[in-house]
A protein has these predicted regions:
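Conserved beta-sheet core of the metallophosphoesterase superfamily
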Residues: 29, 233-241, 248-257, 262-266, ...
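Core catalytic region of metal-dependent phosphoesterases/phosphodiesterases
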Residues: 106, 110-116, 120, 134-247
């Protein structure tokens, strides 16, 4: 019997457009190896071409192409993606974090006559300084969150207010544009993503303990700027307010009990009637409007005399911008008690330029305080 001839395997050849090499845009790149008989060490492959594993990391899974050489040996080319390492710790993106969020019900024991106010201020994500960079700032903030949560576990409240007092990102277009270009460790888009993830973490944590009210003010580092000039509507075209809009969408999607506040599009601040009884009128403003901390009470008086709706009715005003803690009794309030100005602490990487000029620095923290329904505020704060 004659055996039938076997059909030879189809010869596989290298793709016509196959070009081994590396393409890199300064942030991310794609590497394509030449044909190899065994899988290479991709880190070594990059190192041989000037991309150190200490500075670059491989992302995703490699793709392969195979073909048969003239001598019958099979070769494999590997195509993989890599990127420049960021100093940021591994935070999930905002939407990935949201997908893991389940609606929570506050613990049953609530004191409806008490509110806890959390004032994250001047995170300036992306900034580098004597206290480190973004990685260290995030670690500082998360440590503050942990201490705040320990307080909430021990103290029941009927509501929690989160006031983003501004400058949550460093940006690249404040008055220190050139220094920011040199010193920042994240792009504006990366800054926004990291800051949103941080504020989302705070919102999620707080919602476990009580219904939440959350607001963001307009601020100088978050302003929409062109050639150094503010453009657009200040209470709308602001990165901090854009972040809050995204948090509102996510909170609505996952069912968190949160009410959100932003300024009027043509203003930069807002006021909340904390217990909806006309007693505690809590205002938030970044503070850059006053230029210097000593000018804040005067600016507040001017806004009140001019009947500016953003803060004129406030019994308590919280500001940031000046990177230190300060408490000042500032006249009489509509409720029969005192007006109080609270200057919130910063959590940033350090304002070394100011320390060089003034010889002063302040310790980072998140400023918090407690309000009681129908009870005058007496100026007591907590720093976490």
């Amino acid at each position: 019997m004659v055996l039938e001839n076997l059909t030879p395997a189809v010869k596989v050849t290298a793709p016509a457009n196959f070009r081994p090499g590396i393409e890199f845009d300064g942030t991310e790149g794609t590497a394509t190896t030449e044909g190899m008989t065994a899988q290479p060490n991709f880190d070594d492959f990059l190192l041989e071409r000037g991309y150190s594993p200490a500075e670059y990391e491989i992302i995703g899974n490699p793709r392969t192409s195979q073909w048969q050489r003239y001598d019958g040996e099979w070769l494999t080319s590997y195509r993989f993606h890599f990127r420049k390492k960021s100093s940021v710790i591994d935070l999930p993106t905002l939407f990935a974090e949201a997908k893991k969020t389940k609606p929570t019900k506050p613990k049953k024991v609530l004191d409806e006559n008490k509110a806890f106010v959390i004032c994250p201020a001047d995170f300036q994500i992306g900034k580098t300084g004597s206290r480190g960079g973004t990685k260290e700032t995030i670690e500082r903030v998360l440590n503050s969150y942990a201490r705040i949560e320990e307080h909430l576990k021990k103290n029941p409240y009927g509501q929690i207010l989160i006031l983003d007092i501004g400058d949550v990102i460093e940006s690249f277009s404040s008055t220190a544009t050139y220094n920011q270009l040199e010193g920042n460790d994240l792009s504006p888009m990366q800054q926004t993503d990291a800051a949103a993830s941080l504020l989302w973490s705070l919102l999620k944590m707080a919602s476990k303990y009580a219904p939440v009210k959350m607001g963001s003010v307009a601020s100088n580092h978050c302003q929409n700027r062109f050639n150094g000039q503010q453009v657009g509507k200040p209470g709308l075209d602001d990165w901090g307010i854009v972040i809050l809009q995204q948090l509102k969408r996510l909170a609505t999607e996952v069912g968190l009990d949160v009410t959100f506040y932003v300024p009027n599009p043509y203003e930069e601040a807002f006021t909340i009637d904390v217990f909806n009884d006309g007693f505690h009128h809590l205002a938030a403003a970044h503070g850059h409007q006053a230029k210097r901390p000593e000018n804040v009470p005067t600016w507040w008086r001017q806004m009140t005399f001019g009947n500016q709706p953003s803060i004129s009715a406030a019994s308590i005003l919280v500001t940031g911008h000046f990177h230190h803690t300060r408490i000042l009794e500032a006249g009489a309030s509509h409720n029969g008690g005192s007006r109080w100005w609270i200057q919130a602490s910063t959590s940033d990487a350090g304002s070394d330029w100011f320390a060089r000029i003034a010889g002063e620095d302040s310790m980072p923290a998140i400023t918090c305080f407690e309000l009681q329904k129908g009870v005058y505020f007496q100026g007591a704060i907590l720093r976490f």
